[in-house]
Amino acid sequence: AADSDLERVMKERNLSEKDVLAAAKTYQPTGRKDDYMVFSSGGQSGQVLVYGVPSMRIYKYIGVFTPEPWQGYGFDEESKAVLRSGSINGKEINWGDTHHPNFSEKNGEYVGDYLFINDKANPRIAVINLSDFETTQIVVNPVIKSDHGGSFVTPNTEYVIETSQYAAPFDNDWHPIEEYQAVYRGAVTLWKFDYDKGKIDVNKSFSLELPPYMQDLSDAGKGESFGWAFTNSFNSEMYTGGIEKGLPPMEAGMS
């Protein structure tokens, strides 16, 4: 009977054996746990998306840089305070562009007590406690103006690494693009993380000045490369575009 029912459904829905096998590979009966959970950056939603594998069920949208009405994030006093801590120059910024989440580590292995996520549009890092999937802290980088370096950590989560993407003047004043090589700069910030408290310690964090290249992703070494950190860069020629003059646009013209 089961075979005949399956054959009937396949015929009614015009499904091949390959289609049915694909569905069976992702199906999880109610009450059965997924083998894996994925923590994915939500991009310009400003959130973190959590879903299961193989079921692909969405478990939660973790509110991070943007209010989430259905879970009350950004509406109670505690989460309002977290969002306000991400204000820049006194202005509340309740949106973000999340990129490259990373788990906390011990001895270079993921332990997953905490998740870190950066905001590419605004230079911020958020800390998410994975005991309850709640954002507990947002810190603003006072040096850089954008980031894309991910939020990867040193092997025992002593530091969270944040790197600028686009170079900008450190003095926050306007400078013409002709001063790019002389005035514009990038930076890599190492945020000190207090593992027991689950919070970034801003006062014990520091930044290193970088040339005005474009930085991409950063990570800390492990094993033989322990003690080193690595950041890949492009545009070492410090090209500044000029599409209005018939030159290639910024990233298309960079090496």
Q: PLM features: residue spans?
A:
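Repeated scaffold domains used in trafficking and secretory/extracellular systems
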Residues: 19-28, 68-76, 85, 91-107, ...
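Beta-propeller domains
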Residues: 41-86, 117-142, 181-183, 193-201
